[in-house]
Amino acid sequence: MISSSANVPRSGFYYFSQGWKLVSQPGIRRFVILPLLVNILLMGGAFWWLFTQLDTWIPALMSYVPEWLQWLSYILWPLAVISVLLIFGYFFSTLANWIAAPFNGLLAEQLEARLTGATPPDTGIFGIMKDLPRIMKREWQKLAWYLPRAIVLLILYFIPGVGQTVAPVLWFLFSAWMLAIQYCDYPFDNHKVPFKEMRMALRTRKVTNMQFGALTSLFTMIPVLNLFIMPVAVCGATAMWVDCYRDKHALWK
């Protein structure tokens, strides 16, 4: 059994840093390989293509800046770049999580077992196949919750002035919360905790989850490091589950 943090709740920054340590633990590494490969292939290809398009996209986005804000262009330009990286990174992170969802759930389950010494249900390829419909239904629930809110925020980008100042900040906060939901959901879902109940549980420690999601969002924008972020975030979120939520919500002890 690995000791995570003596079951004392810590900050979201702590759990994110724990993810980097836990991902390389003996016995856990083999469950990291498939999520890691999915993320490397998808995020690596996506960000390579993105950087070939930035010279076209950023001027197009800046064209929405009204003349009376042109004097702020030296501030708005980096905000525009960050906005594109945030939106693009979150979109492809979501896609990668869809593809790797069954393996992320297995990684969270095996790590939880090692952190707690508890015995998980029988797993393996047949267990994953049996749970696949439930896992994909859960991913649809997350998408249905996320999409309407994301569309509203994206519309803000096309409002002159607002789109280049307020919208990037709102999108960062939203993506931080959504990434906390995305990764914390794997251990919650392993214990069949309903999606709405999971969101309510996360709100009881909103600052911790926003810290965790904000760091995950930032690292998703950083080339090379973003290739490893999926399994790291799953491990960090699982450590948070063990310390903060498991006692109340665990299905298996």
Curated annotation (Swiss-Prot):
It is a multi-pass membrane protein. GO terms for biological process: cysteine biosynthetic process; sulfate assimilation. InterPro entries: CysZ_sulfate_transptr, Sulfate_CysZ. Keywords: Amino-acid biosynthesis, Cell inner membrane, Cell membrane, Cysteine biosynthesis, Membrane, Sulfate transport, Transmembrane, Transmembrane helix, Transport. GO terms for cellular component: plasma membrane. Belongs to the CysZ family. High affinity, high specificity proton-dependent sulfate transporter, which mediates sulfate uptake. Provides the sulfur source for the cysteine synthesis pathway. This is Sulfate transporter CysZ. It comes from Escherichia fergusonii (strain ATCC 35469 / DSM 13698 / CCUG 18766 / IAM 14443 / JCM 21226 / LMG 7866 / NBRC 102419 / NCTC 12128 / CDC 0568-73). The lineage of its organism: Bacteria, Pseudomonadati, Pseudomonadota, Gammaproteobacteria, Enterobacterales.
